[in-house]
């Protein structure tokens, strides 16, 4: 395994700190700009209006509120060598993402199934079993995290969330964190866990591989991980990866996509 870049003292788990305050409520930061037409929107950025800077700030506030609400109801792994390693990898990859203003961060959850979740603006949740599947291989973990970074950068998650009519209604009535918490209790979890389109998933894989390459890692690590999981699944005669991989295209299709789009 290649050594990961050093992490400065005190930076280990920045996302562990709860989000206590926001500069403005989401109803000001996003709701006013959206005009509450989210259900009819074709694109999240068509809704936000204003400048790119204002849209980005609104996106980050939305993600922070959702991350805080989700962290309160999700079991988290206490800080240890693996969680610190995950944070190192996020910081390492973030340095090579072209969109520098997004504050990517990660929390490791104690869920029993492999799972990962990307929220608007930068927060990422990754489950302990999903990290274990990578067997400590930095570049395989980087591919998994890079895949989630792609959903953020390409606005896959944001488009889905902003178009949800239930969230827009809650944001009209409540401040950001309260609205996010209520939404997660209702339709939010289903919206977040619903499968992305095949094209979105293929694009996220391609993005992740390119990001690992740009960061100086092994660009074939993602394919190696997918092949390993495919072999394990075949050996068990069933999926060993739970719902997380079930919501993606098949492992064989993902491998074929990476090979087809890889620079010659």
Locations of regions flagged by a protein language model:
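A Zn2+-metalloprotease active-site environment signal
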Residues: 2, 10-264
């Amino acid at each position: 395994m290649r050594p990961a870049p050093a992490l400065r003292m005190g930076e280990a788990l920045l996302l562990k700190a709860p989000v206590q305050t926001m500069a403005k409520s989401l109803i000001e930061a996003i709701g006013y700009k959206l005009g509450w037409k989210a259900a009819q929107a074709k694109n999240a950025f068509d809704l936000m209006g204003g400048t790119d800077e204002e849209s980005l700030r609104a996106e980050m506030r939305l993600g922070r509120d959702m991350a805080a609400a989700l962290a309160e109801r999700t079991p988290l792994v206490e800080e240890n060598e693996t969680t610190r390693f995950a944070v190192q990898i996020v910081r390492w990859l973030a340095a090579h993402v072209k969109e520098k203003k997004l504050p990517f961060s990660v929390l490791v959850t104690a869920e029993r199934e492999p799972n990962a979740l990307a929220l608007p603006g930068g927060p990422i949740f990754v489950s302990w079993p999903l990290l274990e599947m990578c067997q400590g291989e930095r570049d395989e973990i980087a591919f998994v995290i890079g895949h989630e970074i792609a959903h953020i950068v390409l606005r896959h998650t944001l488009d889905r969330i902003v178009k949800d009519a239930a969230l827009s209604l809650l944001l009209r009535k409540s401040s950001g964190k309260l609205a996010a918490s209520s939404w997660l209790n209702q339709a939010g979890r289903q919206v977040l866990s619903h499968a992305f389109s095949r094209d979105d998933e293929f694009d996220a894989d391609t993005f992740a591989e390119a990001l690992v390459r740009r960061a100086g890692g092994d660009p074939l690590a993602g394919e190696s991980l997918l092949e390993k999981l495919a072999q394990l699944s075949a050996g068990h005669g069933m999926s060993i990866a739970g719902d997380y991989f079930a919501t993606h295209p098949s492992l064989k299709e993902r491998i074929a996509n990476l090979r087809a789009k890889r620079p010659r």
